[in-house]
Amino acid sequence: MAQGLEVALTDLQSSRNNVRHHTEEITVDHLLVRRGQAFNLTLYFRNRSFQPGLDNIIFVVETGPLPDLALGTRAVFSLARHHSPSPWIAWLETNGATSTEVSLCAPPTAAVGRYLLKIHIDSFQGSVTAYQLGEFILLFNPWCPEDAVYLDSEPQRQEYVMNDYGFIYQGSKNWIRPCPWNYGQFEDKIIDICLKLLDKSLHFQTDPATDCALRGSPVYVSRVVCAMINSNDDNGVLNGNWSENYTDGANPAEWTGSVAILKQWNATGCQPVRYGQCWVFAAVMCTVMRCLGIPTRVITNFDSGHDTDGNLIIDEYYDNTGRILGNKKKDTIWNFHVWNECWMARKDLPPAYGGWQVLDATPQEMSNGVYCCGPASVRAIKEGEVDLNYDTPFVFSMVNADCMSWLVQGGKEQKLHQDTSSVGNFISTKSIQSDERDDITENYKYEEGSLQERQVFLKALQKLKARSFHGSQRGAELQPSRPTSLSQDSPRSLHTPSLRPSDVVQVSLKFKLLDPPNMGQDICFVLLALNMSSQFKDLKVNLSAQSLLHDGSPLSPFWQDTAFITLSPKEAKTYPCKISYSQYSQYLSTDKLIRISALGEEKSSPEKILVNKIITLSYPSITINVLGAAVVNQPLSIQVIFSNPLSEQVEDCVLTVEGSGLFKKQQKVFLGVLKPQHQASIILETVPFKSGQRQIQANMRSNKFKDIKGYRNVYVDFAL
């Protein structure tokens, strides 16, 4: 009588499988595979060979704490002689004297996560022997055409899934600067932290069985991750802070990568890391999504609207000195705002609305009771389809709201100006396999001022008006800020709006910088006044300057001036202005943004003219030099050159340096004091442990500035 077949050991072929599944950057020691793609394993038997006619091998895969056949978190399937279509499948590849090689494949809709793999062997007379073969992790598969995250471009897959560094664009529309970032999605322990993040979500804590079953949907997973990146509803990864007081944590500007943040969250028992702002939330989310296999990129929107009441109007209030006031409505225009786009099919929406989807992890407004935003179809945003899930009205307003300026005087409000094109400029992301910037504004809206753009805006406005009677996706009634804001005379309607006297501009004001605004130097600019009428104009112009946070919140003004300008018909004049370093140095925010404003009025007319300009102060970047050839497992010297751009000494200088595949962990060097206008350098030693294109990111902070940054790309060769 034949003996029952006994398994001696199992080779999961982790190294070979992981290379084929594009997960070898994470590890080759443990099995990480992607759904919809076969992987191989070898069964070694103790007593004899596998006999297909005699032995029946049944595989069992389970994920989550409560595996369930009905929910799809448990699957049972037999070894077949040939590849045949079914949800989970296993087929015979080769059969030897003491071993058998088998291929397995998860369906392209399977839940992602950590799986347990077992087999049952039924050899004869009903005897069944069970074995636990091991664990594996299943990820989304952008290489599989049947997967909802399939991306039909290898360069895009390399950029949006495999690239572990990039740039996040900051500054202002007139001074866009790239901030280098280490995503590090393949670094040690990051995949485990990403899976823990899913398990710490409110969804899992409330109903773990259903949550695990839904992890096959990138729409669902992206919403869960989005909510978990911030800590407003749970023990998410990051605490947000826009107060300029970071004494009990890190200034958001100091971060240069996601790895340190995620590892700190994990090491402290999932206590939120202090602190983040929009680009940090988006960068960490990019790391998690790329690690899970969902193509993701980081997007920056300059002059980004935050419309709190859903009427597509951002109201700004000024006093008679031109100073911007704190907004009682909490509407703001962020100097820049950063979110993510994730690539996925949207079977929950009409056709053509798949592809890039906006997800915003910055906690601004609630969505279905939690702080997350999206996924919102970029195509739906462009077409004004604000009734499509999720949170499309909010994202539409970020890129296409109107801005209304009001003068507050004597308890009354006077309309100064209505701008239909100031919100949503230079929407940017890193180019594919390049360090250049891509402008993708046309993905979000038609050209400003075009007929299509006006039609889309009106369509969105009308949809919001209809929704205001039934509530919104965000659970709040949509209350227009002015009774006419949803009428046919609304901003950018197809009908010509009736103009108030303050809209009839006969005199224009404009600011012009005379020199590039550098940190530590005086700011020199002129106010240009132009009389476009055939009459004399006597102007009184109040000028002011105040620092801004990047979310648009104003700080106290630190400079004021008054100009009296007489203009002949058609005449232009300039009024020179200077703000010295000593005047602004004590008032700067971390973002180094200064808003200069001018409010002009005629002596003989109630007409008022408002103009403002945001100045971003620049400063020298860090220079990084690689000394010699970079080779895996061989010592490498790196020179970091930094300087103090100020005419005063700076204290408490700390340099941080990191780079995936180059440094095992973030390096911190305490530099102490830097003398005025002084340049210095240090040499760091490291041993690269991964080959290919890599990037070094560096940041220097001090008591005067927090984010002097630099980067250097490095190609690491294999060791001979």
Curated annotation (Swiss-Prot):
Cell compartments where the protein resides: Cytoplasm
Active-site residue numbers: C278, H337, D360
Tissue expression as described in the entry: Expressed in foreskin keratinocytes.
Induction notes from the record: By 12-O-tetradecanoylphorbol-13-acetate (TPA) and calcium in NHEK cells.
Subcellular location, principal: cytoplasm
Keywords attached to this entry: Acetylation, Acyltransferase, Calcium, Cytoplasm, Disease variant, Metal-binding, Transferase
GO biological process terms on file: epidermis development; protein modification process
Cofactor list: Ca(2+)
Pfam families assigned: Transglut_C, Transglut_core, Transglut_N
GO cellular component, one term: plasma membrane
Catalytic reaction list: L-glutaminyl-[protein] + L-lysyl-[protein] = [protein]-L-lysyl-N(6)-5-L-glutamyl-[protein] + NH4(+)
Acetylation found in the keyword field: yes
Cited SUPFAM superfamilies: Cysteine proteinases, E set domains, Transglutaminase, two C-terminal domains
Function: Catalyzes the cross-linking of proteins and the conjugation of polyamines to proteins. Contributes to the formation of the cornified cell envelope of keratinocytes.
Record-stated family: Belongs to the transglutaminase superfamily. Transglutaminase family.
UniProt name for this protein: Protein-glutamine gamma-glutamyltransferase 5
Organism in which the protein naturally occurs: Homo sapiens (Human)
